[in-house]
Amino acid sequence: MPTVLTTDLAKVRNIGIMAHIDAGKTTTTERILYYTGINYKIGEVHEGSATMDWMAQEQERGITITSAATTCHWNGYQINIIDTPGHVDFTVEVERSLRVLDGAVAVFDAVAGVEPQSETVWRQADRYRVPRICFVNKMDRVGAEFHRTVDMIVTRLQAVPLVVQLPWGVESDFRGVIDLVAMRGLYWSGEGKGETYDIVDIPADRLDAAREWRDRLIETLAEHDDEMMELFLEGHEPTVEQLKAAIRRATIANKVTPVLCGSAFKNKGVQPMLDAVVDYLPSPLDIGDVVGYQPGDESVLLHRKPSDDEPFTALAFKIMSDRYLGKLTYLRIYSGRLTAGASLLNATKGKRERIGRVLRMHANKQEDIESAGAGQIVAVVGLKLTTTGDTLCDPDHPIVLESMTFPTPVINVAIEPKTKADQEKLSTAIQRLAEEDPTFQVHTDEETGQTIIAGMGELHLEILVDRMKREFNVEANVGKPQVAYRETIRRKVEGVEYTHKKQTGGAGQFARVVIDLEPGGGADGDTGYQFINKITGGRIPREFIPAVDAGCQEAMQFGVLAGYPMVNVVVTLQDGAYHEVDSSELAFKIAGSMAFKEAARRADPVLLEPIMSVEVRTPEEYMGDVIGDLNSRRGTIQAMDDIAGTRVIRALVPLSEMFGYVGDLRGRTQGRASYSMEFHSYAEVPRNIAEEIIKKARGE
């Protein structure tokens, strides 16, 4: 029987679980699903059976790639969980999830502390102002240090941690947690699956530490919450209820981040973390109105309250292909109600869409529901044109919500189908995957006719090619990864003139343009392009100006040095001339394109390459080797740290020097070092290396 999703918004929590690759995020999610009564058998990631990791590759690799959305219930509250991937190649997935969440649980590894990926995700969450609580996981592991992790939350994440629990014991003696809000001990005996725990008095040998940390908790809150400040100054001891209310206010205002601890794998500390989700993270009501603008006019701002009575507004934040259902579109509903069969407007594209079925998702099972209201996250079947980041709304009350920004891909590979039969399957596969993942891009190389796919890193492309094989049965050969170089200019050139004329029998062609070209104001890799029209006195008729602009943009696709796209330039159209009969849009497009190329040649063009931010963790004895190797890859060392006896080296290294690094690093350190890497910026390629790249590109 289809159900109707709850309408008491105060009792809804939309949360994400975010973390570094091995901090134990999927295990934590699994435990949540188990204790909230959805899974009867706990799924273990290292057995490859976890519910949230439902794609075949995830189960093999033990990493979460797609954010599966799951609904569960805890103490009368409905919690919608979006599982987010922790690997840096999947930042787009994290970005997508954060855009539609109200709160998040950041999971940290008590041994490794705050790792680079955690920082990346934390910065993304800061950008979307998502309130968070922290769960310091793996307290049972050798080398676990709760307080060091809390210190790193301050130094690496610039956050204000609010310690609301202390660990009771550590490593193999980890028994449970000390609850500083209610001043009691929570003890897990280790029997069964951790479903039950005992609430006991705090042991005498831990009481002093608990009191000291509780005082710190109250002092920190007083600094960030007026009501707590008054109680503090008047010398009143706050009640548990007053403390919880103050923690909730300060957390939702993004002033503090409550810190809890436990061991998901050993089934300890997960239920109190669920209580904290309910107690401290916001409901859709706390987040308030969502703001969008009127289609076609961004200056007219529109507000929608999180209420079923408002006009319907939702954001499509994820698209997935399901073998049986076809295309599934995940929606976050901000206002109004959605019913199966409804006709909606895709305001981003200005097109009508019809909803087939509305589904509530569990990691890879689903149930049909009749309708869902504001604040809910659902999947729908039947949308044809909607892509990630589009707004769906009531056709009578159009609104466009802010979309998401996706980074441009930094790595390309050529892909060729093995047989003629694979050719058609390949284009279907590529189209489907590109619909799901905006950072996966495809184009055809004009010169070689090859299909080029581009993504955020080697792992990203490996997994996409793997999915083509598994889900679409495409056998394909994949070339070596290529770097996505860009070109730009370093100086301004003025008055570059080009006249395009062809006057041989029949209709002629004539167009003259004069342009200035100069570097834009953005960072080196910005795709920025600006076109300024300074034509006066009708020297070029108005209707031909866009053609000049289009010609310049077309010329930018193939730079003058090595045919890579040009970025970050400003074109100013200063002057020109036309012919009453022979001028046309095409003539001005050609003139614009040729003038741009000529100007670019004169404007000191340079080649840009993607620079990656690399962090290597290595035992002390290999440190010299690792640094020497990074230097030989044109790397610049930015910082060195020591964390729990492991040396951490941060460096900026060109992507072209990082191919195959994983094997080299293993060989150098006997497999004991690990690294992570993410895109940092574009920078100019040194002249000697640029010359080689240009020669190669020109086939010399």
UniProtKB/Swiss-Prot annotation:
Alphabetized Gene3D superfamilies for the sequence: 3.30.230.10, 3.30.70.240, Elongation Factor G (Translational Gtpase), domain 3, P-loop containing nucleotide triphosphate hydrolases, Translation factors
Molecular function as annotated in GO: GTP binding; GTPase activity; translation elongation factor activity
Any one of the GO CC terms: cytoplasm
Domain of life of the source: Bacteria
Keywords, alphabetical: Cytoplasm, Elongation factor, GTP-binding, Nucleotide-binding, Protein biosynthesis
Domain tr-type G: 10-285
Subcellular location: Cytoplasm
Binding site for GTP: 19-26, 83-87, 137-140
GO BP terms in the entry: ribosome disassembly
Family under the similarity heading: Belongs to the TRAFAC class translation factor GTPase superfamily. Classic translation factor GTPase family. EF-G/EF-2 subfamily.
General function of this protein: Catalyzes the GTP-dependent ribosomal translocation step during translation elongation. During this step, the ribosome changes from the pre-translocational (PRE) to the post-translocational (POST) state as the newly formed A-site-bound peptidyl-tRNA and P-site-bound deacylated tRNA move to the P and E sites, respectively. Catalyzes the coordinated movement of the two tRNA molecules, the mRNA and conformational changes in the ribosome.
Protein name per its UniProtKB record: Elongation factor G
